[in-house]
Amino acid sequence: SGEANAAAAALGAAGAEAVGTSSSGVSVVRTGTSRVLFQFDGGAGVSLVVRPGLEDGVKTVTHFRGYRYYGDFQYQRRSGGNLTVVNFVPMEDYVNCVISREMSNSWPLEALKAQAVCARTYAAMNRNKHSSNGFDVCGSTDCQVYFGTAWTGTNTARAAEETAGKHVWYGGRMAQTFYFSCDGGATESVGNVWRSDVDMPYLKGVVDPYEADVASQIEKYTSTVTFTKRELKELLHSKNYMCADVVDFRVTETTPTGNVLTVTVFDAAGKSWSFSKEKARTFFGLRSQRYTISGSGAGYYVNKDGVLPSMSGVYAVNGSGNVSQVPSGSMPYVVTRDGIARMEGEAASGNTFTVTTYGWGHNVGMSQWGANAMARRGHTYEEILKFYFTGVEVR
C-alpha cells in the first residue's frame, strides 16, 4: 500500500515495494481498527509468538477473546487454513486452570487435589491427541475444559501445587483418568460404555455410597424426559430405522452395578431395535447411563377391581411342568370358561414413556460430585482416586 511504501522509504529502503502476503499470510491489526501494524507469511514453521513480560516475579497473563491465560501464545496459519492459536503453558498452571473450571475453587481441597491428579494424568496420556493440528490438547470437552485463569483461586492453585508431578498409575503405566459430573449411584465399567476393558481393568464400575450425601446440591441430579410412541417412531425414522408403530420401549439388559446396558424399541410388526452401551444413552439424548423407563407397553391384565397391573414378575408352568418367568411385554394365552383367549397388552400410561435419569455423564471413572462427598467425609485425594480407579497407585 502507499502507506507501507512510504514507511519503507522513510527507513531508507529505496526502491522497496510492499506486496501482499501468500495464502499463509497473517495480518496483525490494531484492536478495534482496520489499521495493519505488520504482516508476515506464516506456514513452514513461521509463526508469531506473544510472550508476556515479567513484573518483579509476578506471574503475568495474556488476554485472548475475553479470557486471561498464563504462558505464551503462538499464532500460525497453515496454507489456506484458518489461524491456529496455541497457548504454551506450564503443566501446573494448566492444571490449576482446568480444575477451576471442572470443579470450583470453593470445593473441598482433597476433591480439588483428586481432580488435579486426574487432569494432569489425562493431559500427559493424551499429549499427542491433536498433534496433527499443531498442538497437544484442546480446550473443549473433547479433551478438558480450559478457559484460562477466569475461575482460579487460592484452593485450586494449592491443589495443583501440593500434587505437582503426581499421576495415576496402573501396572507400571499411566492410567486413563476419565471423569464426569455425577454417577447417580454407581459408575460403570469401560467395557459396558465404550470399548473392551482388557487393557484398562482399573476402569471398573463401582457402587457409589457417597454421592447421595450431596445429591440435593446437584442441579438436575434426577431428571425426566418423555417420549410418545409417535416421537420414538419419528426418531428411529430419522436415523434410518424403518419401524412400524411403536408398541413398547424398555430396558432389556442392565449391568452388575444397575446401569443400563441395552434398551429396546418394539414395533407393531414384531420387529425390534436394540441400542447398547453408550448408544443406549446418546441415541435418545439422555443425561446418564443410569435410568429407568416407565409407562412401557409391557403386558398387563385386568384384575377383579378393573385395574391394569403389570405382568412383570409373573411365572407360568408349561406342559412339562417347568416353571419360568413370563417375559415382560409378551402376550400369553390363558384358558378361560369360554375357551382360550389371548391376554392383550396395554400400556399403563397410554402412548407416553417416561425416562427417569440419575446423574449426569458417561459414568466411567471418577464422579466429581462423588469426590466432593468423599472429601467432606474426610477422605484424602489418594483414597478418592483409589475408590474410583480400581487397583491404581498415585505417585
Residue ranges and their predicted role:
Residues S1-R395:
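Conserved, single-site charged/polar hotspot
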